Amino acid sequence: MTPKERLADNFKVIERENNTLMSNNQDKNILTKSVLLAVLVIGSSFTCGAETQIWQIDPNHTAAQFSVRHLGISTVRGMFEKTSGTVVFDPSDPAKASIDATIDATTFNSRVQMRDNDVRSPHFLDVAKYPTITFKSTRTEVAGTGTLKITGDLTIHGVTKQVVLDVEGPSPAIKDPMMGNLRIGANATTKINRNDFGITTMPGIVGDDIQIVLDVELTRPAK
């Protein structure tokens, strides 16, 4: 039962008790029932707020992956190896979800050292000047069963643009049998144009569109 449904049930009880109070002339019963009503109302308030959960991104089980066309004939793939951040999520009201995530741009890895050094250089990401990539959500919409559209501000190379993440999940929470904490997972995708972020090096050689895939695992302590 969702918090809204529990609240509605509690108010039905309150209405029934009010009707009883009106027809009951015994002071003791009136006092007892009044206390009951107060407890129900207060309990409803706490219950409605109890569903909000704060989850931490697990860097060891999260991958920020990208793909980009090379010369228009093949695709280069890689990843950033360290992602951190916080997700606030209410299972009963997914539209209230929010994300504040940071990617360590210095961990760029495409499995070719020369290329990785070039991408980290001022030619592309300039990680010495802009060591992080950040995403902060501004709006969340339920797109369907188990799917969300999360709009937010993505900052790369010192430039901030609005993007939309298509999210599958989060999954139901499970308890980690080894660590004892709770875990959920989600997958998010989006596409950006690197030129929008002031990264214009090697046109025609490196594609403009960057496909981004985020496989995220989140954790929080078990109650």
Per-range role (PLM):
Residues 22, 45-47:
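The N-terminal extracellular segments of secreted preproproteins, especially immediately downstream
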Residues 23-35:
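Bacterial N-terminal signal peptides that target proteins for export
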Residues 3-5, 24-27, 52-53:
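Short, basic/polar N-terminal leader/transit segment immediately after the initiator methionine
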Residues 49-223:
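Low-complexity, acidic/polar, glycine-enriched regions of mature
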Residues 1-21:
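N-terminal amphipathic/basic-hydrophobic helices that include classical n-h-c signal peptides
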Residues 34-45:
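Bacterial N-terminal signal peptides
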Residues 7-8, 27-30, 214:
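Short helix-onset patch at the extreme N-terminus, typifying the N->h transition
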